[in-house]
């Protein structure tokens, strides 16, 4: 009975459910990344940091759609592009971690050296900043890196988006 009521609600207001699910999953994904970084002290590589941006975009898009109470085809296309770009970035990062492709210049250090510093200051700057390689995952759970979990999550989001868009609407 509860499941039937839930399914009827989803059929009736599928776009509100889509936005709420996207916001919730994005917050959970970002929270997981920040907990790993700031509580467990795993330093993210540059690609790991870039993989957070699509979730921030999904939160902004979904909140905007909820506030204006309108979800048109352009909003759905923007959500689709955001999730697809996250899939592409996660796939590339996974390939870099597994050695299938070479890391690009994006994977270089995020440390910027100001002009006019002495060698001692530059050494001190490098040794005080943790540098993480894009080729070595910081965490692996069951042999799968966080990047690959991110890819799986984004594939699930694509499937969910497809179900919301193409599942027959209720006539009630």
Curated annotation (Swiss-Prot):
Q: Which GO terms describe its biological process?
A: protein folding
Q: Which domain of life is it from?
A: Bacteria
Which named protein is this? Answer: Uncharacterized protein RP370
Organism, per UniProt? Rickettsia prowazekii (strain Madrid E)
- Which keywords does this chain's UniProt record carry? Cell membrane, Membrane, Transmembrane, Transmembrane helix
Any single GO molecular-function term of the entry would be: protein-disulfide reductase activity
Example GO CC term: the record gives: plasma membrane
Chief localisation class = membrane
Query: Is Cell membrane given among the entry's keywords?
Result: yes
Cellular location(s): Cell membrane
List the transmembrane segments: 20-40, 48-68, 76-96, 146-166
The record describes its membrane topology as: Multi-pass membrane protein
Q: Which Pfam families did the record assign?
A: DsbB
């Amino acid at each position: 009975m509860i499941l039937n009521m839930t399914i009827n609600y989803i059929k009736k207001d599928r776009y509100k459910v889509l936005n709420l699910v996207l916001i919730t999953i994005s917050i959970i994904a970002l929270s997981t990344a920040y907990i790993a970084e700031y509580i467990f002290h795993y330093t993210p590589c540059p690609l790991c940091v870039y993989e957070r941006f699509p979730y921030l975009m999904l939160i902004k898009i979904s909140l905007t759609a909820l506030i204006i109470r309108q979800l048109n085809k352009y909003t759905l296309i923007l959500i689709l592009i955001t999730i697809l770009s996250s899939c592409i970035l996660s796939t590339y990062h996974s390939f870099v971690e597994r050695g299938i492709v070479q890391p690009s210049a994006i994977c270089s250090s995020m440390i910027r050296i100001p002009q006019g510093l002495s060698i001692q200051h530059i050494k001190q700057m490098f040794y005080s900043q943790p540098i993480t390689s894009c080729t070595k995952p910081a965490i692996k759970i069951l042999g799968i890196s966080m990047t690959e979990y991110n890819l799986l999550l984004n594939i699930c989001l694509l499937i969910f988006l497809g179900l919301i868009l193409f599942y027959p609407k209720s006539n009630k």
